[in-house]
Amino acid sequence: MTAATKSLKQDYAIADLSLADWGRKEIRIAESEMPALMAIREEYAKTQPLKGARVTGSLHMTIQTAVLVETLQALGAEVRWASCNIFSTQDHAAAALVQAGTPVFAHKGESLKEYWDFTHRIFDFGPAGSDHEGPNMILDDGGDATLLMHLGKRAEKDASVLANPQSEEERELYAAIKAKLAEDATWYTRKSAKILGVTEETTTGVHRLQEMSAKGTLLFRAINVNDSVTKSKFDNLYGCRESLVDGIKRATDVMVAGKIAVVAGYGDVGKGSAQALRALSAQVWVTEIDPICALQAAMEGYRVVTMDYAADKADIFVTATGNKGVITHDHMAKMKDQAIVCNIGHFDNEIEVASLEKYKWEEIKPQVDHIIFPDNKRIILLAKGRLVNLGCGTGHPSYVMSSSFANQTIAQIELYSHSANYEVGKVYVLPKHLDEKVARLQLKKLNAQLTELSQEQADYIGVKTSGPYKPDTYRY
């Protein structure tokens, strides 16, 4: 019996509720490693700034996410949760939340059909037609929950938007929307009617929001959490620096030292990935389209090449671009026998995985596959091209996720409590003083001692003694 069928009479869909005690023990450990998030929980618990908030959450269902969910609840929110990736759920984390009463719809290894079913179910807060039928807030990672509302609402008026799916993902999404409309023709309009805003976790999701905002089609307010400095410069860089190689090692037990590793993309995620591979003494090459990022890579001592050049020479390939078709079928056809291919960007289309379906696949273990080419060459594909650090590992450490999730919580409070200050259809970032607040809270765990400005020094550089210390244009 699948997780989905087990939950037909219950308001959750998880793998195994008996894992809850294990999950709870790990949640307690994570809480001790998440100082900023726990400090915000303590600061706002009495005032309940999220009382009345109905939060639809679509974000990797991990132990660290469980701490975020319970923080939102401690501040007064009602929460329904699904994972934003079919492989990223930690089943014991999901079980712990369900045991505590949270509706969670996630298990590791979901089908795409289950994924979109679960994403629909996190919008079902109350009876049809009631004032509390749907959410009034979305917390998103990658933008799928936001996409579902927008595309579904468009399809209510024009079914042709679902006519030409371009991928397996789109085929399942479009089928799910068609099925929902067949049973309830105004479901998306009603579910989206009360949504005040969305807070978005990732670069990919932010790009989607900005595109909709530019076109004038974004239905609600949005806060770009990704570009908070204490998110992008820490989660994206330092988180990936630890979790990438953890995922690769767990999946393959490969010796990294001496091998040629190619990192596609040298943004914050690529920078962390390159640092991690070099720390294990790999020869790291970088591919880039942006001359500024390419120059940064070169100045750090990395060799900057094209994927066409690297394809038949490297041993390990990592995509970190947020784009599509970065590693093509032709690239993989040229690769060495036993080359390792993985992705730490958001979606699986960075690698042309669909082009490999015509070949024989041999599962080595869950999320680790040999792809056998006609000449019997094999490449090792990790997590089927989805996030390797969460598909083959446990994702980022708790400490760095504390910064990200503290920003998410602050953003939820800000949008819910002060929605009138934000214009519908616009994308905002959190102010600098809140970024600095998160950093201060994180530093306490490290026993760091901050130097304090005198009033004379503050006047000299034109800031307050309490900050903010940098202009919004400052690049950390």
From Swiss-Prot:
GO cellular component, alphabetical, reads: cytosol
| Molecular function terms, GO-annotated | adenosylhomocysteinase activity
- Reported cofactor(s): NAD(+)
What HAMAP family does the database record attribute to this sequence? AdoHcyase
The places in or outside the cell where this protein is found are: Cytoplasm
Question: What is the protein name given in its UniProt record?
Answer: Adenosylhomocysteinase
Gene that specifies this protein: ahcY
Keywords from the UniProt entry:
Cytoplasm, Hydrolase, NAD, One-carbon metabolism
What are the leading ranks of the lineage?
Bacteria, Pseudomonadati, Myxococcota, Myxococcia, Myxococcales
* Pathway the protein acts in: Amino-acid biosynthesis; L-homocysteine biosynthesis; L-homocysteine from S-adenosyl-L-homocysteine: step 1/1
Gene Ontology terms: biological process: L-homocysteine biosynthetic process; one-carbon metabolic process; S-adenosylmethionine cycle
